[in-house]
UniProtKB/Swiss-Prot annotation:
Protein topology in the membrane: Multi-pass membrane protein
Signal peptide range in chain numbering: none
One GO cellular component term noted in the UniProt record for this chain: membrane
Species for this entry: Acidianus bottle-shaped virus (isolate Italy/Pozzuoli) (ABV)
Keyword Membrane: yes
Subcellular location: Host membrane
Designated name of the protein: Putative transmembrane protein ORF85
Key words, A-Z: Host membrane, Membrane, Transmembrane, Transmembrane helix
Source taxon at top rank: Viruses
């Protein structure tokens, strides 16, 4: 399922990447329920990136971080545009 390339890198097949993306989305959904602060899942995702040492957990952590940051930026931009207009 995972081919080890060199010593620190993984080469995931496309189906595994889809499963990891879905896992990231599901994990983000659970982590976003922890706090009303939109940056909490981003911080937890970054922690997972460092705990995973470049493997599957790091990949899921990166997905969570990306979703959390894009959602937080989207909320901030929406709030700013609501105040301006």
């Amino acid at each position: 399922m995972v081919e080890i390339v060199g010593s620190n890198y993984f080469n995931f097949p496309p189906t595994t990447l889809i499963v990891l993306a879905l896992g990231s989305a599901i994990a983000y959904k659970f982590l976003s329920n922890i706090s009303t602060n939109p940056y909490v899942p981003a911080v937890l995702g970054i922690i997972l990136v460092f705990l995973g040492h470049g493997g599957v957990i790091s990949t899921i952590g990166a997905g969570i971080t990306g979703l959390a940051i894009s959602r937080a930026i989207g909320k901030d931009v929406f709030n700013f545009l609501s105040k301006v207009s």
